[in-house]
From Swiss-Prot:
Transmembrane segments: none annotated. This is Mitochondrial distribution and morphology protein 34. Lacks alpha-helical transmembrane segments, suggesting that it resides in the membrane via beta-sheet conformations similar to those predicted for other outer membrane proteins and porin. The SMP-LTD domain is a barrel-like domain that can bind various types of glycerophospholipids in its interior and mediate their transfer between two adjacent bilayers. It is found in: Mitochondrion outer membrane. The gene is MDM34. Belongs to the MDM34 family. It comes from Zygosaccharomyces rouxii (strain ATCC 2623 / CBS 732 / NBRC 1130 / NCYC 568 / NRRL Y-229). InterPro entries: Mdm34 (IPR027536), SMP_LBD (IPR031468). Component of the ER-mitochondria encounter structure (ERMES) or MDM complex, composed of MMM1, MDM10, MDM12 and MDM34. Residues 378-389 have a biased composition (Basic residues). Keywords: Lipid transport, Lipid-binding, Membrane, Mitochondrion, Mitochondrion outer membrane, Transmembrane, Transmembrane beta strand, Transport. It is a multi-pass membrane protein. The keyword Transferase does not apply. The lineage of its organism: Eukaryota, Fungi, Dikarya, Ascomycota, Saccharomycotina.
Length: 584
């Protein structure tokens, strides 16, 4: 079963006006119970509040940012709603006449709401919080912002239970499908309000809309006398005289031009969100307090070299910005000391010579006067220059210098006469002894100073690379300090053959007598290790060359050797002898 609504009733503006009034009344009545205390007057952060006690005093008060009531300014139904009756129960019950289940669908509806909210959330929380937990604010005045919300393209599909009673129509929504577009005049608060509206839709269809429909249906069930009585009561309420503001002579002083100017600046500051000097309790009126928006002006008036040469500073900043854009943000730019300390001259002023010394002196004096006391004396830099001449040295030592130069060539042949430098024998002449002139006699005194002969570069195959490097460094030195030989050393000390000299090599580099024919050293692993490139003793001349075994590739392919050196345990070493290079 279904029926159609009269389309002319929806096209008539009177129906929209009734809907607008009923929605306004329903929204304000539902929000009045849960509204927080409204601030009526604020003085130095302390406000007097008018509280509305709810039914139960034990419930906690909810924070509400609504400053005024909700006003539905416009309602429009371009498309006629549709109502479909799914189930109907007509029974002679004492409480209801008709009971049914219906499906309601509405499309392209529009609703516009206007209200005012409190922008100072600190005031809302401070008035609803205990006094011991609320700090004393310097400026905690109320600041209201008007907001207009428009709901367009509303699409509603719902399953409802309808109860027709003697006094009106009761309705409840079971299954609701709602979609709409939301637009707010405050774009900053649009996302927040939209999120809160979605959470409050349950309250809207559970309490607000049923009360609106029931109040509108009462006009159909009330008698004519009751309707006339209600209209008469409304007219009496409208005919009450509105209260007038009566000003006394004492109040005229508060309406002075200065107070009116102060009130006008207060209103303009709330509308533009700006702070003026005429408003009380703002940082600009507090002595010694500086606002953030005026900080650049204060810095520009400070006497400093950077402010006097501001044009050079701006050019350097623009140049750094251009370099940063061209190079990229990943490359760090060098930090200039001029940017860190503003009381410095730019480099360009020094290069171009555009500075003025009297001006710089005046700026420095003003900075010193502002930062120090009058009784404090400035610390001047003093430069002391001694004008005393240098003492002239006597010329007597200059005459002695040529004498010393003449004596030096005489001492050199004497040293050569004491001990001639022996020639370096070659490897072929290593077996021949080194002969020294027998005519040279050693002095009898034990502390005879003689020059040491140049060391003999005898090639020993057993010496390691480290010993060779030491011998080369020793031979490279051109100057050798004079040596003092003991009395026991005579000229016969230098007549030993070269094989005795080679026997004086360090013990750790001397060859060890090892029996290589032992069965311990003839294993396949050690034989391959001697002839392989990776052997640490492959270059030594002590190993006997042997033929390569056929299994040599097994060790060469596997380069991850499981040993460090030769595990030689057959030789017995004394306490005085050094161990071999590779010992287990």
């Amino acid at each position: 079963m279904s029926f159609r609504f009269n389309s002319q009733a929806f096209e008539d503006n009177s129906f929209n006006e009734k809907i607008r009034e009923k929605l306004t009344q329903a929204l304000n009545s539902s929000s009045s119970d849960s509204r927080s205390p409204k601030v009526t007057k604020t003085t130095m952060g302390e406000g007097s509040t008018s509280k509305k006690d709810s039914g139960s005093g034990g419930k906690s008060r909810k924070f509400d940012i609504l400053k005024s009531g909700i006003t539905v300014s416009k309602v429009n139904f371009p498309t006629t709603p549709q109502l479909e009756i799914l189930d109907l129960d007509i029974s002679a019950q004492p409480r209801s006449l008709v009971k049914g289940i219906c499906k309601i669908s509405c499309k392209d509806a529009m609703l516009q709401i206007q209200t005012e909210v409190e922008a100072n959330l600190l005031l809302v929380y401070s008035e609803c919080s205990p006094s011991f937990a609320t700090p004393n604010m310097i400026c905690n005045d109320s600041f209201t912002i008007p907001i207009t919300m428009v709901f367009s393209e509303i699409r509603l599909e719902a399953i409802t239970n309808i109860f027709v009673k003697h006094s009106g129509i009761g309705i409840s929504f079971n299954d609701v499908n709602l979609d709409f577009k939301f637009d707010c005049s405050m774009k900053i608060l649009q996302s927040t309000i939209e999120r809160r509206l979605k959470n409050s839709m349950h309250h809207l269809f559970k309490e607000v809309l049923p009360s609106v429909i029931f109040s509108m249906s009462q006009s159909l069930f009330l008698s004519e006398a009751a309707r006339n009585q209600e209209m008469h009561n409304e007219s009496r309420g409208d005919s009450r005289p509105s209260p007038r503001v009566v000003l006394e002579e004492s109040d005229l002083q508060e309406l002075s031009p200065a107070n009116m100017l102060r009130l006008s600046t207060l209103i303009s500051s709330r509308q533009t969100l700006s702070l003026h000097g005429t408003v009380l309790n703002v940082p600009s009126t507090i002595p010694g307090c500086l606002e953030r928006q005026n900080l650049h002006r204060f810095n520009s008036r400070i006497p400093s070299l950077s402010n006097y040469y501001a044009s050079y500073k701006e050019e350097e900043k623009s140049r750094q910005v251009e370099v940063k854009k061209s190079v990229g943000s990943s490359v760090p730019l060098p930090h200039t000391s001029f940017a860190a300390n503003p009381n410095l001259l730019p480099v360009r002023t020094l290069q171009e010579g555009a500075y003025d010394l009297p001006t710089i002196t005046g700026i420095q004096n003003r900075i010193f006067e502002r930062s120090t006391d009058e009784n404090e004396r400035p610390r001047r830099r003093k430069l002391k220059i001694k004008m005393s001449g240098r003492k002239q040295q006597p010329q007597a030592p200059k005459e002695e210098e040529p004498k010393q130069a003449e004596q030096q060539p005489e001492t050199e042949p004497q040293q050569q006469r004491l001990l001639p430098t022996p020639e370096i024998p070659s490897r072929e002449q290593a077996s021949t002894p080194v002969d020294i002139d027998p005519t040279v006699s050693t002095p009898d005194s034990p502390d005879t100073e003689i020059t040491s002969p140049k060391p003999l570069s005898i090639r020993n195959p057993i010496l390691s690379d480290v010993e060779k490097m030491d011998s080369e460094d020793a031979s490279a030195k051109s100057f050798v300090a004079p040596l003092k030989l003991p009395v026991s050393i005579t000229s016969k000390y230098f007549n030993y053959p070269a094989d005795h000299i080679s026997a004086q090599t360090p013990r750790r580099y001397s060859p060890q007598r090892i029996n290589w024919e032992d069965a311990l050293f003839n294993t396949s692993e050690l034989s391959n290790l001697r002839t392989s490139l990776y052997s640490p003793i492959a270059r030594g001349s002590l190993l006997n060359p042997t033929k390569e075994r056929p299994d040599r590739g097994r060790i060469l392919d596997n380069r991850r050797l499981s040993f460090v050196g030769l595990n030689f345990k057959g030789g017995k070493w004394g306490d005085d002898d050094d161990p071999p290079p590779y010992s287990g």
